[in-house]
Amino acid sequence: MKEEISVCWFRRDLRLDDNAALYEALRGPYPVLPLFIFDTKILKKLSNREDPRVTFIHHTLQEIHSELATQGSTIAVEYGTPEEVWIQILKNYNVKAVYTNHDYEPNAIERDDALAEYLASEQIEFKTFKDQVIFEKNEILKADGKPYTVFTPYFNQWRAKLNEFYIKSYPINNYFNNLLKIASLPLPTLAEIGFKESSQKFPSKRFGSKLTDYEDKRDFPAVDATTHIGMHLRFGTISIREAAQQALKQKANKWLSELAWRDFYMMILWHFPRIVHQSFKPAYDNIQWLNNESDFEAWCEGKTGYPLVDAGMRQLNQTGYMHNRVRMVVASFLTKHLLIDWRWGEAYFAEKLLDYEMASNIGGWQWSCGCGNDAAPYFRVFNPELQAKKFDPDQAYINHWLPEYKQQKHVQPIVEHAFARERVLKVFKDALNE
């Protein structure tokens, strides 16, 4: 008779400390086998065989694998569709319960609903927990029970509700003896899952020192004043509770509000999954985009003739990261100066950003375009040259990512600002019948 076990399925929570599902699994009645699935449905969509995010996940799994070995346990790392893998897991083990953390993206919800149904048919419990946000789903609502769609009142309630209970870490170390005692299972190589090692450098998990000057310096792209932990929050290598604890400890209120924006966009995506393909404000889907492919290519390659836009795109293409102020500028430029559908830009960011999160990325793009909930008004058209003067006055950022600018070899602007502004105002007004 096979030993009865629980399985803890890791997804966007790649850490052994302060992990809600792992904590609950280890406190349950059965020894726990950790599991990670390299989902072929997701991997097949990645065009770059050296995608740095896959390398990052693989490195992180190696660390988890080694740490579990010191506890006399292991992590099962499988490759395939979740459906295929779970059928095999149930053949190999006597699974009594499955624990995992919530995911708010529509495809993930569909996947988890299907798994819950399958496990129920096998008389196996499926238990899910909040882990990647402070407040989720219906935890912050208006008095009428409806979700907030404007950030400021949402944040006021979020901040008022925030207390030690919601950010307390889960003391997992106390329960490591409840891990399944088993010889180490082999970890598939990157080559075995169809990828190659990326040479990309990844951001540090240490961010506390960045919080002191964050509010004053965060808008200046040449100053390394942001934490760069977006990637760690996205893959769960840092706990959101730990991040909030640090913010409160250092009274970094502006940075704390950025964590709340992340919660807000996750909540919006959960309540309004249609925003994956549609504008939050439906009227904006009437916009007659130009969608000129050569203009889009110039934007992607950082060859628009606007130095701040081009520097941002070069930074993105070379590092998988772009400063947040510059993200707003390049998104506004694509949608308003070039009249290219925000979905094109969102998809390009999804392909390139190491810290890509669907909820925040869609939220940011719709904000910049004007078509999102609580978005910038459509008639607010960033002037990239004024943005550069204000936030990169010494041109340190531009010169770093755009060396030809210093040598005066930079390309001419592909569209004139005043013309583009008048054009977009007319196109948007026509679409909105204003």
Which functions belong to the PLM regions below?
Residues 124, 145-284, 388-434:
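Glycine/tryptophan-enriched, flexible segments
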Residues 4, 124, 224-399:
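Active-site-proximal binding-pocket segments
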Residues 12, 113, 263, 326-328, ...:
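Hydrophobic alpha-helical segments, especially transmembrane helices
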Residues 47, 51-55, 299, 388, ...:
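Charge-dense, low-complexity intrinsically disordered segments
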Residues 73, 100-103, 314-317, 335, ...:
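A broad detector of the eukaryotic-type serine/threonine protein kinase catalytic domain
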Residues 1-162, 426-431:
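Trp/Phe/Arg-rich N-terminal binding region typifying the photolyase-homology
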Residues 21, 60, 64, 243, ...:
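Alpha-helical packing segments of well-folded alpha/beta enzyme cores
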